[in-house]
UniProtKB/Swiss-Prot annotation:
InterPro entries: Dynamin_N, P-loop_NTPase, TRAFAC_Dynamin-like_GTPase. GO terms for cellular component: cytosol; plasma membrane. The gene is iniC. This is Isoniazid-induced protein IniC. It comes from Mycobacterium tuberculosis (strain ATCC 25618 / H37Rv). PANTHER family: SARCALUMENIN (PTHR43681:SF1), TRANSMEMBRANE GTPASE FZO (PTHR43681). Induction: Specifically induced by a broad range of inhibitors of cell wall biosynthesis, including antibiotics that inhibit the synthesis of peptidoglycan (ampicillin), arabinogalactam (ethambutol), mycolic acids (isoniazid, ethionamide) and fatty acids (5-chloropyrazinamide). Down-regulated by the nucleoid-associated protein Lsr2.
């Protein structure tokens, strides 16, 4: 029986217990809450994007979805928690504090905007945006107000979502955008990280060095500078045991790459073919690039539009890519997307979140159910908790995620090669057998033997007499991961 099936069984037994309790059998609200907990198992993974004001969250949402669906201007919509879900047709719904739901008019002025003139934002809980994007089929993305916003209410909305007072998790994972490693960000990350270690809240946290092209002042090598910054962030956050990775991303370049227009490609190709001295002079600064008296072969108005869409870094990168031999808009878009860092971020999200989505959702459901039966006690409450706690404590996929988070910040008796191998075997590079064993996916015949060898190796390493308790725990986690693969291969025979 899978973990999700076990959660459903516990939930079914819990519902029966409440139906048998005189105080609750007529409480429709109680059964609605239990139904919602169960429904989470069938829903897409919930991933929240968080960070300080102007960190680039909405732009990154747009880049991940591949469309301008999250308002990026300083409107009321950016001060409200917004849920982006898959739907057959575009629709925006406002959820009011009293339970009322209202449709919100959608406008298009360069990008999506929500008309909230007839709605008091202070009365809203959140907004729900349904959009027919393939990227939203398997993941619901939650855009949050800046945590250091001058509007206290906006910041509090985000805190209520990420660090709920009732301990019931609203999301399954968090992508946290960082421009600097300031005290406010570290404090919030520690709170979320504390929830991870305490077996409640989101089990997965990924950091993003956002607006990465601005770290290097828009220079052609800006992403290299951003990569160095991301490594420093990773090192410092790892030492605190807060998150496993920080990825540098230029959300603006990623969004532009995913929505590149043929007219923009033609204009960039003209610029790339301009006289080299004049072009280099124009690319020195924003003012030079948009000067009306510039001899560049592209109208100043179009250059201003390119600047808004690409930024100076994106324009410089596009011209360099075209000069290197790319000949069509598809090739340019692919190169820009790769260089934006979005591909690397999506790979990390896939490894840490998507490949473990069932386990993350099961964890959220278990924590929510445990909190619910404590808040609404019935005679069966101790028995429900007795069923839940072993799953939260012992389910191996949860332990893998915790170990991946804890390993960088804890001292062990393992050497660097052993730590790298252990991270890989517990799923740090992906959850497929090939990824865990470091094998070519095409060479599947070696996998059963490699899994058995890994189980034997880590069993011996777990029994080493000089191990400290944490090292032994880590090695035992590797043993269980390897043994699970051995069992899976045996079942296929």
């Amino acid at each position: 029986m899978s973990t999700s099936d076990r959660v459903r069984a516990i939930l079914h037994a819990t519902i029966q217990a409440y139906r048998g309790a005189p105080a609750y059998r007529q409480r429709g609200d109680v059964f609605c809450q239990l139904d919602r907990i169960g429904a989470r198992l069938a829903e897409p993974l919930r991933i929240a994007l968080a960070g300080t004001l102007k960190a680039g969250k909405s732009t990154l949402v747009n880049a991940l979805v591949g469309d301008d669906i999250a308002p990026t201007d300083a409107t009321e919509a950016t001060r409200i928690v917004t849920w982006f879900r898959h739907g057959p047709t575009p629709r925006v719904t406002a959820n009011h504090r009293g339970g009322r739901r209202a449709n919100v008019p959608i406008t298009r002025r360069g990008g999506l905007s929500f008309d909230l003139r007839r709605i008091n934002p202070a009365e809203l809980i959140d907004l729900e945006v349904e959009w027919p994007a393939e990227e939203l089929i398997d993941a619901t993305i939650v855009d949050t107000p800046g945590t250091s916003s001058l509007a206290c209410d906006a910041s509090e909305r985000t805190l209520r979502l990420l660090v709920p007072a009732d301990g019931v998790p609203r999301v399954d994972a968090v992508v946290f955008l960082l421009r600097t490693l300031n005290a406010a960000d570290v404090a919030l990350l520690k709170q979320i990280g504390g929830l991870v270690g305490g077996s409640v809240g989101a089990l997965g946290i990924i950091g993003v060095a956002s607006r990465a092209d601005e770290i290097g002042a828009g220079r052609i090598d800006a992403m290299l500078s951003a990569n160095d910054v991301a490594k420093r962030f990773t090192r410092e956050l790892n030492q605190m045991g807060i998150c496993q990775a920080v990825v540098p991303v230029s959300g603006l370049l990623a969004l532009t790459a995913r929505t590149l227009r043929q007219t923009e490609f033609i204009a960039l190709r003209k610029l790339a073919g301009a006289e080299r001295t004049e072009l280099n002079r124009a690319l020195l600064s924003v003012d030079r690039f948009v000067r009306r008296d510039s001899p560049l072969p592209v109208d100043a108005g179009i250059r201003a539009q390119l600047l808004e869409r690409f930024g100076m870094f994106g324009i410089r990168m596009s011209i360099a890519v075209l000069a290197a031999g790319v000949t069509d808009s598809t090739g340019l878009a692919a190169e820009l997307l790769e260089r934006s860092g979005l591909v690397a971020l999506r790979n990390v999200i896939d490894q840490q979140f998507a490949q473990r989505s069932d386990m993350l959702k099961a964890h959220t459901a278990l924590v929510s159910l445990r909190r619910f039966v404590q808040t609404h006690p019935v005679p069966a409450t101790p028995y429900v908790i007795a069923d839940i706690d072993p799953l939260l404590a012992d389910t191996h996929a949860f332990e893998e995620l915790r170990m991946l988070s804890l390993l960088p910040s804890r001292a062990t008796t393992l050497n660097d090669d052993e730590i790298a191998s252990l991270r890989r075997i517990i799923g740090g590079s992906g959850t497929s057998a090939a990824a865990r064993l470091g094998l070519d996916p095409a060479n599947s015949r070696e996998a059963p033997r490699a899994a058995l060898a890994a189980a034997q190796h880590w069993r011996r390493r777990a029994a080493h007499p000089l191990n400290d308790p944490f090292t032994t725990r880590a090695c035992r986690a590797a043993v269980r991961s390897a043994e699970a693969m051995v069992a899976e291969f045996s079942a296929r025979r």
